[in-house]
Amino acid sequence: MKQLKWTAWILAAALALGASGCSAQALDTIPLGPSEDTSAGAAPTPQQQLEDLGLSLEEASALWAQLPEPRRQALRNASQPPEWLSYLAFDFAWVDRLDRYEAYHQAQPQLTAEEVVVQVNIGLDTPPYENPEPVEEPDSLTALVNQYHILSEDYVPKLVYLEAAYTNQRDRLRPEAYRAFVRMADAAAQDGLRIYNASAYRSYSTQKWVYQRYVRREGAAAADTYSARPGYSEHQTGLALDINTASFSDHFEESEEYAWLVENAGRFGFILRFPEGKEHLTGYQFEPWHYRYVGVAAAQQCWEENWTLEEYIARQPAPGRD
């Protein structure tokens, strides 16, 4: 019976290898096959523990190759799968962030493993502005600019001026964002609503002036909840704009235009950038007027999944796992 079990497993492994094109040599590093101890209480093998995450043989092998030796040894010796293994069930979990996931989960035990991975990937286990990462591809439509990702002072995208019918001031956007905004504004007009730009591109120096004005008025702690520091503003990308207003006192969220945008912005490639209930992820208060162009595919996924841009980026496959 034991030989039959081994034979069946070998055939299954051979089929998996043939289908994936993975070489036997690539799998030498992961303990494969059923445990010699077939009793009900037998410790699961590393392969079994990884496959229990829903990974294929190829995916399990690739993940095993990324694990540092102490983590591998923990799997070899475990009578039960270690808790940190639950993070790796998600293809957006980074192996080199396992220590951070564990530490953050200890500090936030109420979170699920998925929430832990997403929030650490966003950077929430570290204070904002403390060690920002430079935005590597500032021209990307989904470039993440926030309290953890900074644009260089001299970054200026390609920009075009908005026609007077679509703005209340002389202003600029990236060409692709402007074209999409025109289509969206025209569609809203067909429904009897007017949406227009109130504030679009801001240079580094302009954002510096805006932020310092708020700091003088209310202090840095308060300003940081609704105004970006210079270099940390999406407005510098030329992909963000404030629609119809940029004031909390106007209560844009109560307008018909806001309701229309919530339902339709994604069709044109825009997302509500700082939604209500996601302040702990974005770092900013709810801003019903602030929209960001990310392209139709990303915008629709964010709308369908109720994700912020932070969550969208945090859920992209980790290196070696796509």
Q: What do the PLM-derived regions correspond to, one by one?
A:
Residues K2-Q25:
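Sec-dependent N-terminal signal peptides of Gram-positive bacterial secreted proteins and lipoproteins
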Residues C22-S199, Y204-D322:
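Extracytoplasmic cell-surface/polysaccharide-interacting catalytic and binding patches
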